[in-house]
């Protein structure tokens, strides 16, 4: 039952980001809105044709296929872990990572770019220009949970 919950949560999170991206696509270009009453978090529409921060945007086919392969590998790893007992932290991390990976991969294949929409105002102009989406946060949080899971596993193993 827990495995179904994990798979359902993964699908829900991916669909949530895809739905938000569909709404963001209706926004006018170049418009920036504050998120709620925040002065630091802004919403804006950015089309990213590359990977993180438009890296490799000159090679859209490479980016599309690399994204597809990596999302597939992450999904297989997630499915293999879901079959085992324990490792809840790793399973949660993989589920988050898979949700973010597929959300961005589907964007690349359906639109030809990834829709990013969350930015942060900082004192550094370069950092302020970086724009994210929920899928990016899912990937980052998932990576942290996987690393934490591995760290705790090795720590416990070493203390026995």
How would you label these PLM feature ranges?
Residues 1-160:
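Alpha-helical transmembrane bundles and membrane-interface segments of multipass inner-membrane proteins
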């Amino acid at each position: 039952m827990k495995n179904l919950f994990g798979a359902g949560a993964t699908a829900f999170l991916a669909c949530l980001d895809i739905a938000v991206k569909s709404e963001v696509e209706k926004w006018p270009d170049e418009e920036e809105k504050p998120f709620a009453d925040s002065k630091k978090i802004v919403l804006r529409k950015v089309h990213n044709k590359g990977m993180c921060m438009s890296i490799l945007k000159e090679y859209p086919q490479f980016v599309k296929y690399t994204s597809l392969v990596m999302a597939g590998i992450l999904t297989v790893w997630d499915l293999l872990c879901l079959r085992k007992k324990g490792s809840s932290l790793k399973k949660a991390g993989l589920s988050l990572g898979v949700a973010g990976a597929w959300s961005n991969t589907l964007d690349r294949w359906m639109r030809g770019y990834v829709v990013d929409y969350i930015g942060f105002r900082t004192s550094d102009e370069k950092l302020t220009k970086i724009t994210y989406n929920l899928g990016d946060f899912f990937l980052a949080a998932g990576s942290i949970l996987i690393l934490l899971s591995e760290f705790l596993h090795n720590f416990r193993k070493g203390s026995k």
